[in-house]
């Protein structure tokens, strides 16, 4: 059966081949008929036909696959029929594809034609807009045109008719004709100006007469000056006797006129504070007045000088071209140039010691600097550990917290330094002085860090607000350093000075003795194993001073390091301890060492003594000696060792140990004289 069906299909194949031979001849005729057919057919119906044809194809393919999978011989005819149906559907899909391409081409052609029309309309619109803009410019020019007479400010029309004579105003003509009215108003303006010119000449003559009278009176006043000077000279002894130096004050005020604004504000506010609150504060002005006067030249003169200096520079460059290094050095010197005048403030203490502050103004950097000089009232003993206490470079460091005076407070200076190769102002501080922030405040200068300003104005109110507090801090700093100097001299000799007012803080008998007191560096302090907690808390900084102490009793040795803040005694010293006795005992492995540290670091207010509390450091060291006695005397004795105790108990303790940490009674109770726990 299958072979018969194949034989029957052969003539069909031949007919299809005949059709293919004539396909090329009939192609053009069908192309045009299909193009016309596109306009008649509905695209939606073609789309639906496409979907139905695809579904039929899918159905036929699945049926053919099922028949082939069965493999029966009777299904061959049915498969061939379904193949024929599939070919018909493929032809339908090809036709739909051709129709879709024809529609796409027509849509593109229509879109292109519409776009050309839109472009043509847009070009016409642009041309019209350009013409409109051109016309608007011409209209604006016409409207902005002003005649010369419009620049003249004429009197109002009402005033013109009320004040102008009839011969000029001509109301019968000008009231109806604006042009004639304007001409008449201009004539009246000319008449008024002629009258004012005559008055001006009369005023000039009167001015010349008055100037001559002024010159005569000036000559008379100048003739009185020598007589007044002689009277002032004669009154000098009286002024000195009455402590009323009016002549010196007058000269100071005359010199103050040549001070720059920040130094002038500092001079005025310090003088006012001295007169009102502190008679022991002396304010003077020093420096070259002639050089200061030369700086205050009119702008025109300065421009002429600049042009002359430029010409001189051109001549010098023709003769000799300096090297780049010399040019940079000259620029640095010019950048760091100080004003010829300076203000000196002398603080006197009750005991007679004086602190002299000299304030300078760096003109190009727009900042103030200060230099310090200390004159003690008594001769100080030489103490190695007190070498930096009265060092002028460290004396005023951190007067306010964080203000070490090593960097410029003006943010704009860094850009100036970059141009001339200055890395940091700290390299020139020894020559220029320290630019502390409180120094800027005393001069009325304030530099906001968020938005740098090129020109900063000196503020009197800012200076007045900082003056009293700063003067008190300066005097306190001087007294505290002098007191520490005396204490260090005693500590180096193993003696702890305790004043009479503070002797009640300690028992009458303290056996432990201070055997060593010396200064150490910041790096040495960081290397110690028992200072880690203080460093992590941020209580040790490079600006602080560091000291090492050793307290001994028998075989026990208590090592301690002290952090001394520049703001002593407002900021108390911080102690870290290490006991070498039967091993190394630190606060990390011995709770009693930790309690001893808290006794001097936490309860320091008990040891301040009478105000201002300059004896705090020595009282803390004396308490450490007392605490070491308690620690050793309350330690249990090993009964297996024969002989007397190394540290016999001499302190009265209500209770030797307390709590699971077995802490010792370190609190001294006066006047009972016993020790207890806190």
Curated annotation (Swiss-Prot):
Cellular location(s): Nucleus; Nucleus speckle; Cytoplasm
Any one GO CC term of the record: THO complex part of transcription export complex
Primary localization: nucleus
Keyword Cell inner membrane: no
A GO molecular-function annotation: mRNA binding
Region (Disordered): 1-35, 294-329
The organism's place on the tree of life at top rank: Eukaryota
Short motif Nuclear localization signal, span: 7-10
Amino acid composition bias (Acidic residues), ranges on this chain: 301-314
Family, per entry: Belongs to the THOC5 family.
Protein name according to UniProt: THO complex subunit 5 homolog A
Encoding gene (name): thoc5-a
């Amino acid at each position: 059966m299958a072979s018969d069906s194949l034989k029957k299909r052969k003539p069909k194949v031949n007919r299809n081949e005949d059709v293919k031979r004539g396909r090329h001849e009939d192609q053009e005729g069908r192309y045009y008929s299909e193009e016309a057919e596109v306009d008649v057919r509905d695209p939606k119906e073609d789309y639906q036909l496409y979907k139905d044809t695809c579904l039929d194809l899918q159905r036929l393919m699945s049926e053919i696959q099922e028949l082939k999978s069965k493999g029966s011989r009777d299904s061959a005819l049915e498969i061939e029929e379904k193949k024929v149906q599939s070919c018909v559907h493929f032809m339908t899909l090809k036709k739909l594809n051709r129709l879709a391409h024809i529609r796409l081409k027509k849509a593109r052609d229509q879109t292109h034609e519409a776009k050309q029309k839109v472009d043509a309309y847009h070009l016409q619109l642009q041309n019209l807009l350009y013409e409109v803009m051109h016309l608007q410019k011409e209209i604006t020019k016409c409207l902005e045109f002003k005649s010369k007479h419009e620049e003249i400010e004429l009197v109002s029309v009402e005033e013109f008719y009320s004040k102008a004579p009839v011969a000029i105003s001509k109301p019968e003509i000008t009231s109806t004709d604006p042009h004639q009215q304007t001409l008449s108003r201009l004539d009246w303006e000319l008449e008024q100006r002629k009258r004012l010119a005559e008055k001006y000449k009369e005023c000039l003559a009167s001015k010349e007469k008055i100037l001559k009278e002024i010159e005569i009176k000036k000559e008379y006043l100048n003739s009185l000056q020598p007589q007044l000077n002689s009277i002032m000279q004669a009154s000098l002894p009286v002024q000195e006797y009455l402590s009323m130096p009016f002549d010196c004050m007058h000269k100071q005020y005359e010199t103050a006129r040549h001070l720059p604004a920040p130094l002038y504000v500092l001079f005025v506010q310090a003088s006012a504070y001295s007169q009102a609150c502190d008679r022991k504060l002396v304010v003077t002005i020093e420096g070259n007045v002639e050089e200061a006067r030369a700086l205050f030249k009119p702008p025109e003169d300065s421009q002429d000088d600049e042009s002359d200096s430029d010409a001189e520079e051109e001549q010098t460059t023709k003769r000799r071209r300096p090297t780049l290094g010399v040019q940079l050095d000259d620029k640095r010197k010019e950048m760091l140039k100080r004003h010829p005048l300076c203000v000196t403030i002398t603080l006197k203490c009750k005991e007679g010691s004086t602190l002299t502050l000299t304030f300078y103004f760096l003109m190009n950097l727009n900042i103030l600097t200060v230099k310090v000089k200390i004159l003690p009232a008594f001769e100080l003993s030489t103490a190695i550990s007190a070498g930096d206490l009265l060092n002028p470079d460290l004396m005023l460091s951190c007067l306010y917290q964080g203000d070490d005076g090593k960097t410029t407070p003006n943010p704009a200076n860094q850009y100036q330094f970059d141009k001339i190769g200055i890395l940091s102002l700290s390299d020139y501080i020894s020559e220029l002085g320290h630019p502390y922030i409180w120094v800027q405040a005393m001069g009325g200068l304030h530099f906001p860090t968020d938005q740098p300003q090129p020109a900063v104005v000196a503020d009197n109110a800012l200076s007045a607000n900082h003056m009293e507090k700063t003067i008190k801090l300066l005097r306190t700093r001087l007294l505290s350093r002098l007191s520490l100097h005396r204490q260090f001299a005693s500590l180096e000799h193993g003696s702890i000075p305790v004043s009479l007012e503070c002797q009640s803080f300690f028992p009458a008998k303290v056996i432990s003795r201070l055997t060593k007191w010396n200064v150490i560096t910041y790096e040495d302090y960081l290397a110690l194993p028992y200072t880690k907690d203080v460093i992590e808390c941020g209580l040790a900084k490079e600006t602080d001073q560091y000291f090492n102490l050793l307290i001994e009793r028998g075989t026990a040795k208590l090592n301690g390091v002290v952090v001394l803040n520049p703001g002593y005694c407002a900021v108390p010293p911080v102690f870290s301890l290490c006991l070498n006795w039967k091993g190394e005992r630190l606060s990390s492995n011995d709770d009693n060492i930790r309690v001893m540290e808290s006794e001097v670091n936490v309860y320091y207010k008990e040891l301040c003594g009478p105000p201002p509390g300059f004896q705090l450091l020595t009282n803390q060291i004396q308490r450490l000696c007392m605490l070491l006695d308690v620690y050793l005397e309350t330690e249990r004795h090993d009964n297996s060792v024969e002989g007397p105790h190394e540290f016999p108990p001499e302190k009265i303790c209500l209770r030797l140990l307390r709590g699971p940490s077995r802490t010792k009674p370190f609190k001294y109770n006066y006047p009972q004289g016993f020790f207890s726990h806190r």
